[in-house]
Amino acid sequence: EKKLSGNFLVVIDGTPECESAVRYAARRSELAEKELVVIVAIDNQKETHWLGVERKIIEEAEENTKILIEQLQKNISGFSKVNISYEILHGSKINIVNNIIRDKSDIGYLVIASNNKGESPGELVEFISKSGFSIPVVVIPGDISNDNIDELVGIK
Protein backbone atom coordinates (compact mmCIF):
# COMPACT_ATOMS: atom_id res chain seq x y z
CA GLU A 1 0.00 0.00 0.00
CA LYS A 2 1.28 3.45 -0.94
CA LYS A 3 1.92 6.09 1.70
CA LEU A 4 0.31 9.45 1.03
CA SER A 5 3.32 11.23 2.44
CA GLY A 6 5.75 10.40 -0.34
CA ASN A 7 7.65 12.49 -2.84
CA PHE A 8 6.10 14.44 -5.70
CA LEU A 9 6.52 13.13 -9.25
CA VAL A 10 6.27 15.39 -12.28
CA VAL A 11 6.87 14.49 -15.93
CA ILE A 12 8.27 17.22 -18.14
CA ASP A 13 8.17 17.49 -21.90
CA GLY A 14 9.05 21.10 -22.64
CA THR A 15 5.47 22.23 -23.20
CA PRO A 16 4.31 25.50 -21.61
CA GLU A 17 1.76 23.66 -19.46
CA CYS A 18 4.40 21.43 -17.89
CA GLU A 19 5.89 24.58 -16.32
CA SER A 20 2.67 24.95 -14.31
CA ALA A 21 2.92 21.36 -13.08
CA VAL A 22 6.58 21.84 -12.17
CA ARG A 23 5.91 25.02 -10.19
CA TYR A 24 3.04 23.44 -8.26
CA ALA A 25 5.02 20.24 -7.57
CA ALA A 26 8.13 22.19 -6.49
CA ARG A 27 6.14 24.43 -4.15
CA ARG A 28 4.23 21.49 -2.61
CA SER A 29 7.41 19.42 -2.27
CA GLU A 30 9.19 22.25 -0.50
CA LEU A 31 6.29 22.89 1.89
CA ALA A 32 5.95 19.16 2.65
CA GLU A 33 9.75 18.81 2.99
CA LYS A 34 9.72 16.09 0.33
CA GLU A 35 11.80 15.52 -2.77
CA LEU A 36 10.65 16.55 -6.23
CA VAL A 37 11.21 13.72 -8.70
CA VAL A 38 11.38 15.01 -12.27
CA ILE A 39 11.07 12.53 -15.11
CA VAL A 40 11.79 13.24 -18.75
CA ALA A 41 10.45 10.59 -21.11
CA ILE A 42 12.21 10.16 -24.42
CA ASP A 43 9.82 8.28 -26.64
CA ASN A 44 12.03 6.57 -29.19
CA GLN A 45 9.18 4.74 -30.92
CA LYS A 46 10.15 6.20 -34.28
CA GLU A 47 11.54 3.24 -36.15
CA THR A 48 14.22 3.70 -38.72
CA HIS A 49 15.82 1.08 -40.89
CA TRP A 50 19.28 2.44 -40.21
CA LEU A 51 20.80 1.90 -36.79
CA GLY A 52 23.12 4.92 -37.14
CA VAL A 53 20.20 7.25 -37.84
CA GLU A 54 18.24 5.87 -34.88
CA ARG A 55 21.25 6.32 -32.59
CA LYS A 56 21.67 9.91 -33.82
CA ILE A 57 17.98 10.65 -33.14
CA ILE A 58 18.30 9.29 -29.59
CA GLU A 59 21.53 11.23 -28.95
CA GLU A 60 19.88 14.44 -30.16
CA ALA A 61 16.82 13.81 -27.96
CA GLU A 62 19.07 13.21 -24.93
CA GLU A 63 21.03 16.40 -25.62
CA ASN A 64 17.80 18.42 -25.91
CA THR A 65 16.61 16.81 -22.68
CA LYS A 66 19.77 17.87 -20.83
CA ILE A 67 19.23 21.46 -22.01
CA LEU A 68 15.59 21.28 -20.87
CA ILE A 69 16.69 20.04 -17.43
CA GLU A 70 19.27 22.84 -17.10
CA GLN A 71 16.60 25.43 -17.94
CA LEU A 72 14.19 23.82 -15.50
CA GLN A 73 16.78 23.77 -12.72
CA LYS A 74 17.52 27.46 -13.24
CA ASN A 75 13.80 28.28 -13.25
CA ILE A 76 13.06 26.31 -10.07
CA SER A 77 16.06 27.73 -8.20
CA GLY A 78 14.55 31.19 -8.78
CA PHE A 79 11.59 30.43 -6.52
CA SER A 80 12.34 27.26 -4.51
CA LYS A 81 15.10 25.44 -2.67
CA VAL A 82 13.42 22.04 -3.03
CA ASN A 83 15.61 18.95 -3.34
CA ILE A 84 15.23 17.63 -6.89
CA SER A 85 16.19 14.37 -8.55
CA TYR A 86 16.08 13.97 -12.32
CA GLU A 87 15.72 10.86 -14.43
CA ILE A 88 15.85 10.58 -18.20
CA LEU A 89 13.98 7.45 -19.26
CA HIS A 90 13.22 5.94 -22.65
CA GLY A 91 9.68 4.90 -23.58
CA SER A 92 6.17 6.26 -23.58
CA LYS A 93 5.17 8.67 -20.80
CA ILE A 94 2.28 6.43 -19.81
CA ASN A 95 4.42 3.29 -19.45
CA ILE A 96 7.16 5.15 -17.59
CA VAL A 97 4.75 6.76 -15.12
CA ASN A 98 2.94 3.45 -14.59
CA ASN A 99 6.22 1.66 -13.87
CA ILE A 100 7.52 4.34 -11.50
CA ILE A 101 4.31 4.48 -9.49
CA ARG A 102 4.17 0.69 -9.32
CA ASP A 103 7.85 0.16 -8.47
CA LYS A 104 8.88 3.15 -6.34
CA SER A 105 7.30 3.21 -2.91
CA ASP A 106 8.65 6.71 -2.20
CA ILE A 107 6.34 8.39 -4.76
CA GLY A 108 3.25 9.76 -3.05
CA TYR A 109 1.78 12.17 -5.60
CA LEU A 110 1.74 12.67 -9.36
CA VAL A 111 1.41 16.25 -10.60
CA ILE A 112 0.50 16.89 -14.23
CA ALA A 113 -0.91 19.81 -16.19
CA SER A 114 -3.72 19.73 -18.70
CA ASN A 115 -3.29 21.05 -22.21
CA ASN A 116 -4.67 24.58 -22.36
CA LYS A 117 -5.17 24.85 -26.10
CA GLY A 118 -8.72 23.44 -26.19
CA GLU A 119 -7.54 20.23 -27.80
CA SER A 120 -7.19 16.95 -25.95
CA PRO A 121 -6.15 17.48 -22.31
CA GLY A 122 -2.97 15.47 -22.91
CA GLU A 123 -2.16 11.78 -23.04
CA LEU A 124 -1.46 11.38 -19.31
CA VAL A 125 -4.63 13.23 -18.30
CA GLU A 126 -6.70 11.09 -20.69
CA PHE A 127 -5.07 7.88 -19.46
CA ILE A 128 -5.59 8.73 -15.79
CA SER A 129 -9.24 9.62 -16.34
CA LYS A 130 -9.80 6.15 -17.80
CA SER A 131 -7.64 3.97 -15.57
CA GLY A 132 -6.47 5.83 -12.47
CA PHE A 133 -3.41 5.34 -10.29
CA SER A 134 -2.77 4.08 -6.77
CA ILE A 135 -1.67 7.54 -5.60
CA PRO A 136 -3.33 10.98 -5.64
CA VAL A 137 -3.02 12.77 -8.96
CA VAL A 138 -3.09 16.56 -9.11
CA VAL A 139 -4.07 18.02 -12.49
CA ILE A 140 -3.14 21.69 -12.82
CA PRO A 141 -4.65 23.87 -15.55
CA GLY A 142 -1.89 24.48 -18.07
CA ASP A 143 -2.57 28.20 -18.29
CA ILE A 144 -2.75 28.99 -14.56
CA SER A 145 -0.54 31.91 -13.48
CA ASN A 146 2.42 31.52 -11.14
CA ASP A 147 0.68 33.76 -8.59
CA ASN A 148 -2.41 31.55 -8.69
CA ILE A 149 -0.29 28.42 -8.24
CA ASP A 150 1.43 29.99 -5.23
CA GLU A 151 -1.94 30.98 -3.79
CA LEU A 152 -3.32 27.47 -4.39
CA VAL A 153 -0.37 25.95 -2.56
CA GLY A 154 -0.70 28.44 0.29
CA ILE A 155 2.45 30.51 -0.32
CA LYS A 156 0.65 33.88 -0.67
Regions found by a protein language model. Give the residues of each.
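Small/aliphatic-rich secondary-structure junction motif
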Residues: 3-52
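A short acidic, amphipathic alpha-helical/loop segment
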Residues: 21-27, 96-100, 124-127
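Short, solvent-exposed amphipathic alpha-helices that sit
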Residues: 24, 60-72, 96
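Acidic, proline/glycine-rich short linear motifs
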Residues: 40-67, 149-155
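A short helix-to-beta-strand connector/capping loop
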Residues: 77-85
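Charged docking surfaces used in two-component/phosphorelay signaling
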Residues: 88-96
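Gly/Ser-rich helix-loop-strand patches that form or flank binding pockets
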Residues: 103-156
